[in-house]
Amino acid sequence: PVPINKTQRSFYGASYLFDQIGKLTGVEADLKACFPDTYKKILSLAYYLILEENNSLSRFSHWQRLHIHPHGKDIPSQRSSELFQSIEEKERVSFFEKQGKRRIEKEYWAFDITTISSYSEVLKQVKNGKNKENDHLPQINLALLFGEESGLPFYYRKLPGNISDVKTVKQLMHEFDVMGYRKVNVILDRG
């Protein structure tokens, strides 16, 4: 008999579910193609942010000791900041293209713009603009494109708060052209 040196209890259910979703949707494969050296860290941080939505990334060290996750090791808060900063626009667009191609034939794309009010005086994109709530705070606009059936987002863009929805849609159509999408079905709301 071999003596037991260490015992450990780890949570795996949610990670297993996310692993399967990542495989079925192509998210894991597309992340691996676009971020070959860091995709496991990205997945681990995504799992954490979904499961611990109210906790800051500084708590990842504690969480990762109790949960099985793709990276399998700690990602200190400073390293996660560096990881997010290292993501280049070219890589991000490549990921969006890959995800969009998986959805283009199968479903309509839904597009929505939301405003996020802010008191920040240092963020360049925080500007005075119009919003549905009619609050007169500076804001940033977030444009999101997602599969209508799957509900999976595969494109986002942060925009200055003073950019109108019409200009945003024109920019989106230009970006579709750049990404090689010639014929797409997009659902928009009247907002």
Where do the model's predicted regions map?
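Short secondary-structure boundary/capping elements
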Residues: 136-137, 164-168
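Acidic, metal-coordinating catalytic cores used for nucleic-acid/nucleotide bond scission
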Residues: 187-191
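Dynamic "connector" segments at or just before major functional cores
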Residues: 1-125, 143-162, 170
